[in-house]
């Protein structure tokens, strides 16, 4: 089964649901905060939702990420 998320997007959202901040995610993955925000925005746009929270809920529902 093909994933909706790229490997990096999945890494970011997996950290997001663990309560990591954008800054912490950037540090953990050795990327800039802007890059983290861009990945999050891309996923929000892909899903057609309004926020990070809605994206997380939708991704869990779609079984793209696990709690």
Give the role of each language-model region.
Residues 10-14, 44, 56:
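Hydrophobic residues on short alpha-helical segments
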Residues 1-33:
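Helix-turn-helix DNA-binding segment
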Residues 39-42:
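Residues within the DNA-recognition helix of helix-turn-helix
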Residues 45-67:
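Basic, Lys/Arg-enriched C-terminal extension of HTH/homeodomain DNA-binding domains
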